[in-house]
Amino acid sequence: MEKIDVLVVGCGISGISAAYHISKHCRGTTFAVLERRAKLGGTWSFFKYPGIRTDSDVFSFGFGWKRWESDNIVAPAKDICQYLDDAVDEHGLRQHIRLNTDVVSASFSSATQRWTVTTGAGGTIVCRFLILTTGYYQYEKPHMPAFGGSDRFQGTFVHSQQWPESLDVAGKRVIVIGSGATAVTMVPALIDRGAASVVMLQRSPSYYYVAPKHKKDRALSVLERLFGARIGYFLQKWLTILQGAVVYAYAQWFRAAAKQRFIAEARKLCPDHVDADTHFSPSYGVWDQRLCLDPDGSLFAALRTGRASVVTDHVARFVESGVCTGGGEVLEADIVVSATGLTLQHNFPMSTMKVSVDGVPYDAPNHFVFRGCMLSGVPNLFYILGYTNASWTLRADMMARYFCDMINYLGRHGMGMLCPCADGVEESQAVPFNLRLSRHGFTLAAWASPPLERNDPSPP
């Protein structure tokens, strides 16, 4: 049996951020980070589909404590993984990380004020605090709609979350079902890999924010020349964050104007044979769903090649040669990719762990969320989620620091346990836990997640 102060479960962006802040702001605190996979990095080392990259700029995506050195403002997954590896090594965190170690169960005892955690290998770790940084979706189960007749298709049918690295698209006809961040990333990448044709088959359009791919712009050069590399980079980071906040606020306050602006931009970028009003005019408002980043307008550039196209219709059924749309059109393909999103964790945020407090199993709907990082009736447990309308890392860094402040406060006052209490909170005061966006996968999992206390100032 091993005894430590803090156990972090998950070694993606949030887990690495938590490890850094504990090592820096909680001196003398013993901790470990468990990762069930053989490689750290979370999403960025797990997904393998062509073109996988950030859907936000690297200034805001990078940690506040680690400068991003790559030349691209939009980074591919391999650069992100290298960045995370460098961050871990530069700050001496690798000694605390244990790969290939999953957590089966965790039980809290109020008598001892400790968590007892059991790993898949049968090991036991006793800790004071448990931090969950396992994300929000299921790794093993992507969101796959029930497409009729998919077993009849004679070609290759894959989900983007389960992309086989050996799959060769050169000379092949490809259909990508979906129009979100994954689809807008894959379509240009598939063209670059030599696909004969790529059809983006979307049930409904999305908004695309076109931004430059390279960060060596005039603003950064001027700031670094005036204030030096470190301060100039810091200023550029916050200017970029402010720009994103302004775009989001504009979309919320001036909904009609924001919608028309994005549609007008799509009209300018579309080639003549693509009808922007049909394929790039969503029925919802800007930022009602996450905005898709299109670096250098690569999706529109792919459309201009004539090898990529967009079809706006639903999938009626699969046929032997491809997909039949609701309008009766048969789209022939050698490869069909379902880029239809993620399946959220059930019993969030416990992932696949069995969790109990004093012998009572955790059941999400019976708990309230406190400040977007704790759960009522579950002592000494924190979870970390990023933003849905900005870079994930910004909130992950902030919540990791908040955790450190809380355990330091407990230490200064001789306390051993912290537990949000829902006493006095009526059922009518609860609001659904929904990550603020209406994306299909988020709303599907709302029933399996704890409600928010209506007066909670910090929902996720």
Where are these regions (language model features)?
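Rossmann-like dinucleotide-binding core of oxidoreductases
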Residues: 3, 7-8, 13, 17-33, ...
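Beta1-alpha1 glycine-rich phosphate/pyrophosphate-binding loop at the start
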Residues: 4, 8, 13-97, 202-203, ...
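Short hydrophobic core segments
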Residues: 9, 103, 124-137, 174-177, ...
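Glycine/threonine-rich phosphate-binding loop and adjacent beta-strand/alpha-helix elements that clamp
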Residues: 49, 197, 335, 339-410
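Short beta-strand to alpha-helix junction loop
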Residues: 68-86, 98, 177, 250-259, ...
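Feature captures the FAD/FMN-dependent oxidoreductase FAD-binding
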Residues: 71-138, 317
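Glycine-rich beta-alpha-beta "Rossmann" dinucleotide-binding loop(s) and their flanking helix/strand
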Residues: 130-161, 193, 305, 331-364
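C-terminal catalytic lobe of FAD-dependent flavoproteins
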Residues: 254, 261-321, 325-351, 430-460
